[in-house]
C-alpha cells in the first residue's frame, strides 16, 4: 500500500507571541516541522504535502525540495487544510497519514505502528490516541465493544460518562486516501467557529459502515502539540532526556544529563565523556574516548577519537584524532585540525587547516591559512588576511616555527623548517630553513631616565 502524508503547518501560532512562524520554532536546534519530516522519511512515505499559510516562504526555505507544498490562504479549520492537498492526492489508492507540524516528539516507530494497525484492522480511518493523566480540553475517544472507535467527542460536548474517559485524540490520523477526500466534501462548518473539522470525517466513515480503528501511543508525552512557549520548553526537555538516555545506553558518559543539550541527529562514540553545560547540535559526529566540555558549544562538526574539547566553541569544523582544543578556543567556518594538534587559550581559527602535530597554544587568530605538520605558532601569532576588500591566504609549511607576537601579512608563505623571530611583521615569503627577523633593532639610551 502506498503511503502519503499531509503535514498541517498553516496555523499562525498566535499563542507563541512571536514573529517566527510557529512550526519553525526550534527544539534542540531543529525546527519542529523538520523533526516531523525526518520521522516521515524513515517510514517509506512516498509523498509529503506540507500545508502552509502564514509564513509559507519561511517554511519552504527551511524544508526546501524535501517535501511538496499546498497553500491554505484562509485558515478555515483542519478539514479545510487537508483539502488543500486534494489536487496532489485525490483519486490515488493508498493510506494518508495526517500529522501536525507542531508535534516534534512523534517517532517513526509510533507512526509505523499506527500504519501497521490501520492495515491489520482493514480500517478506513485510524486515530492515534494517548492516555492522559489530565484529559481536560482534549477530545475523548469513545470505543465500542469490539475495540474500534464509535466516535470522538470534543471536551465541551462530552457527557459526564465521556468526560471520565482518559483516552484522548492526538490529532494524528491515518485515512484511506480515496475515502478522505470524498468525505471532506461532506464536512460542513455548522459550528461555533464556522470551521471545517477533520474529525468530522470519522463520523462520516462510521455512518457509511466503515471500520474506524484506534492505536494508542506508547506515552502521552510523544503526542504533545506545541502551542506556546511553555509547551515548547516541555517538548525540548522531553526530547533532551530521550536523546541523552539513548546515548548513555550506547556507552556515552554524561556527568550531568540535565544540563547537557544534544540534538537527536548527533552521533557519539562509546566511552566519550560529556561534561555539564555542553551543547552539541546539528550534523555532528564525535568519536570514541573523547572528552567534551564543560561549557562547550559544538555544531555541525566532526571530532575524531580521543580528542579533547574544553570550554570552546566549534562550528562547521573538523578536529582530528587526539587533538586538544581549549579552554576558550573558537573554531569556525571550515577549520580543520589534524591528529595530535593543539589549539589553546583564546585562539580563533577560521577557514584554515592544521597539519598533524601543529600547535597554536595562546592568543592567536588564524584565518584563511594552511598550517603544515608540526608547526608551532607562538603566543600572539596573527594571520593578517583581510585588506578591507579581499581575503588572502597564509601558508606555513611543515616544521616551521613562528615566534610570539608575529604578524603574517597575507598573501605570504613561510617555508619548510623556517623560523620567524618573535615580534616580526612578515610581508614577504620566508625561504625554507631561513631565519626571518622583521623588527626594529633595540636601542638602549644609557642614563635616559636621570635627565
Swiss-Prot record:
Active site, per annotation: 362 (proton acceptor)
Cofactor(s) in the UniProt record: Mg(2+)
Domain of life: Bacteria
Region (Pyrophosphorylase) location: 1-229
One cellular-component annotation, GO: membrane
Pfam families hit by this protein: Hexapep, NTP_transferase
Catalytic activity: alpha-D-glucosamine 1-phosphate + acetyl-CoA = N-acetyl-alpha-D-glucosamine 1-phosphate + CoA + H(+); N-acetyl-alpha-D-glucosamine 1-phosphate + UTP + H(+) = UDP-N-acetyl-alpha-D-glucosamine + diphosphate
UniProt: UDP-N-acetyl-alpha-D-glucosamine binding residues: 8-11, 22, 72, 77-78, 139, 154, 169, 227, 332, 350, 365, 376
InterPro entries (UniProt xref): Bifunctional_GlmU (IPR005882), GlmU-like (IPR050065), GlmU_C_LbH (IPR038009), Hexapep (IPR001451), Hexapep_transf_CS (IPR018357), NTP_transferase_dom (IPR005835), Nucleotide-diphossugar_trans (IPR029044), Trimer_LpxA-like_sf (IPR011004)
Binding-site residues, acetyl-CoA: 385-386, 422, 439
GO MF term list: glucosamine-1-phosphate N-acetyltransferase activity; magnesium ion binding; UDP-N-acetylglucosamine diphosphorylase activity
Keyword annotations: Acyltransferase, Cell shape, Cell wall biogenesis/degradation, Cytoplasm, Magnesium, Metal-binding, Multifunctional enzyme, Nucleotidyltransferase, Peptidoglycan synthesis, Repeat, Transferase
Top EC category: transferase
Family membership: In the N-terminal section; belongs to the N-acetylglucosamine-1-phosphate uridyltransferase family.
Quaternary structure note: Homotrimer.
Name of this chain's protein: Bifunctional protein GlmU
Source species of the chain: Exiguobacterium sp. (strain ATCC BAA-1283 / AT1b)
